[in-house]
Amino acid sequence: MNSVDLTTDLQTLLTGENVQMNLSVPHLVEKILERKEGVLTSSGAVRATTGTYTGRSPKDKFIVEEASTKDKIDWGAVNQPISEAAFDRLYAKVLGYLKERDELYVFEGFAGADEKYRLPITVVNEFAWHNLFARQLFIRPEEHDKKPEEQPFTILSAPHFKADPLVDGTRSETFIIVSFEKRTILIGGTEYAGEMKKSIFSIMNFLLPEQNILPMHCSANIGEEGGTALFFGLSGTGKTTLSADPKRKLIGDDEHGWSSTGVFNIEGGCYAKCINLSEEKEPQIYNAIRFGSVLENVVVDSKTGEPDYSDSFYTENTRAAYPIDAIDNIVKPSIAAHPQTIVFLTADAFGVLPPISKLTKEQAMYHFLSGYTSKLAGTERGITTPEATFSTCFGSPFLPLPAHVYAEMLGRKIDEHGVGVFLVNTGWTGGGYGTGERMSLAYTRAMVQAAIEGELDKAEMRTDRIFGLHSPVHVPGVPDQVLDPAKTWTDENEYEEKAIHLAKAFKQNFKKFSNTENIEKAGGPLV
């Protein structure tokens, strides 16, 4: 099947009588309820459930091995190759399947808030609720927008279509397959809506660096007087909490590009975790869940329609999808100047990293590549011990190119714009998990504020002899003792032992990278 056939077949699909094109939010909600795909909750949001898969299926994700891209992609466990022939066969099957549906829902929009770099996208859905999700998460066209000249990237989403691994070359009945040459993403066998969002992010991670734009898995905000800040961090590090600052406007909560003119949101909405969500803790998210929003896998009372955010019956990974303008305190459009401050968040459950450190460019590149946090792994006897976790560039599942490409771009941009980069430990202090305690949120907020406001630029620093990190001796609003992790432990020898253990884990993890020897030498632990 050549690209001409593919385009013609797609056009035939998109002009079929079963196609519902660019439906409004109320119309989509009507369809969802009519088709019993979801229920209306007391806040007016739609709740849908996703069946077997309540999260992404990374082992079922493939990139087509094509002449134009095969030498650029970092093939391996994250970027698994699949042949063009296998893609073409599956494409024809999915197309045939979608043509036979009684209704299809199509959204035409964009990824990328900066008009110079935005990517036109077309999302074709078997489910009306998936189309509402796409409409709220991606960028909705304005009336004055011209029809894009560039061929859109198309998502064909067929959750009820299941692959046959023996025939189709997939690992299971579920598949997420990207073809860069054919500008198409096939999704089947999973109802989890996040696959659409993250597939578009993955392709932006491939396309943007070609335009000298750094794609980033981070949140971003800006102060009243300017001063853009970026927050990187894996799940549980406090990224959402710390970037939702009432004194600062939100640019975006998850995916951004950094171009020669500044930063821009890749999306037009938010996909927020909502396990244990409360109005007191996260008012921005809580109040954004209203008519037009989508709740995914949240338990809802069948009589009152009240969501129970504390109930993880379906999954811990409950989500809310809503347009960014459901939040009051935002930048419109979602574009801002070059960042002044970058914050890497880590929840160190070993309790050995300083609460805040100012990083050199090389240390910033090292910690960006490392993407460290720790998770608490439960054992059968109920004992929980910390485990070091590393996710390259804080977004390992979404990086098609070799990691050093992203790290080198970050290094160049830090140099060009004189950006202050900080590593902030929101994890444990006074000992590891089980003996120490979680870092006070008030102290973390004070440290982040001091970093963003430039108060640490000329502060007196102490250098950690294990990690080589430079930490301020004083931060307004934080006791001095808290700033030196060794001093918070009752046994400094035990602290040193645990710190060396973590430093070795960093070094072990770094062995997987190529072309990074200089970064490790100048930015890694000293032991």
Swiss-Prot record:
Pfam short name (any one): PEPCK_ATP
Residues binding Mn(2+): 198, 217, 254
EC number(s) stated in the UniProt entry for this protein: 4.1.1.49
Entries under InterPro entries matching the protein: PEP_carboxykinase_ATP (IPR001272), PEP_carboxykinase_C (IPR013035), PEP_carboxykinase_N (IPR008210)
Cofactor: Mn(2+)
Compartments where located: Cytoplasm
A single GO BP: gluconeogenesis
Molecular functions per Gene Ontology: ATP binding; metal ion binding; phosphoenolpyruvate carboxykinase (ATP) activity
Note accompanying the cofactor annotation: Binds 1 Mn(2+) ion per subunit.
UniProt KW keywords: ATP-binding, Cytoplasm, Decarboxylase, Gluconeogenesis, Lyase, Manganese, Metal-binding, Nucleotide-binding
Binding site for substrate: 56, 192, 198, 319
CDD domains per record: PEPCK_ATP (cd00484)
Leading EC class: lyase
Main function: Involved in the gluconeogenesis. Catalyzes the conversion of oxaloacetate (OAA) to phosphoenolpyruvate (PEP) through direct phosphoryl transfer between the nucleoside triphosphate and OAA.
Name this polypeptide is given: Phosphoenolpyruvate carboxykinase (ATP)
Encoding gene (name): pckA
